[in-house]
Amino acid sequence: MAVEIPNKEQILADWEAHPMRRPRIEKVTINIGVGESGERLTKAEIMLQQLTGQKPIRRKAKKTNRDFGIRRGEPIAVKVTLRGPKAYELLKRLLAAVDNRLKASSFDEHGNVCFGIEEHINIPGVEYDPEIGIFGMDVCVTLERPGFRVARRKRKRAKIPTRHKLTKEEGMVYMMEEFGVEIVEG
């Protein structure tokens, strides 16, 4: 069942009147947690590079976990961060893999959204390769407003005021308007 956002019209009117308040995609981060190093991690790395056209980085285990046979510092995951038009185009394909539906609980209080893809072969344009196998992945979309650079720059750094931060509802409205996503309860 689709979720109705009560102040959707008000948010859209605010963006129309103030273009600097309209959100945009800062980055899209794709993570594949394999849970082990070796051949399977290398295959995940190859698959992620084919999907994004960018070289992924390896993520290391923070703690030793004997039950899973993981040592601290051992590479167990790969991730890639996309920005700009590349991120926008890939996000369209990734949303198609989940039928353009996102849970309301997938959004955090700052409007960012994360969702999972169970099998990478669900993404349009991706063929099954028996050499690589099938991998699932986590996709995190970070949204920002124009002007967020003041928090990251080296000189004259400043905090983002609360009134300029994104809300959960604004993140939902942005995804609905920009990508035609249906937000469901959950």
UniProtKB/Swiss-Prot annotation:
GO terms for molecular function: rRNA binding; structural constituent of ribosome; tRNA binding. It holds the Pfam family Ribosomal_L5. GO terms for biological process: translation. Keywords: Ribonucleoprotein, Ribosomal protein, RNA-binding, rRNA-binding, tRNA-binding. One of its GO terms (cellular component) is ribonucleoprotein complex. Part of the 50S ribosomal subunit; contacts the 5S rRNA and probably tRNA. Forms a bridge to the 30S subunit in the 70S ribosome. NCBIfam families: PRK04219.1. This is one of the proteins that bind and probably mediate the attachment of the 5S RNA into the large ribosomal subunit, where it forms part of the central protuberance. In the 70S ribosome it contacts protein S13 of the 30S subunit (bridge B1b), connecting the 2 subunits; this bridge is implicated in subunit movement. May contact the P site tRNA; the 5S rRNA and some of its associated proteins might help stabilize positioning of ribosome-bound tRNAs. Belongs to the universal ribosomal protein uL5 family. This is Large ribosomal subunit protein uL5. It comes from Pyrococcus furiosus (strain ATCC 43587 / DSM 3638 / JCM 8422 / Vc1). The gene is rpl5.
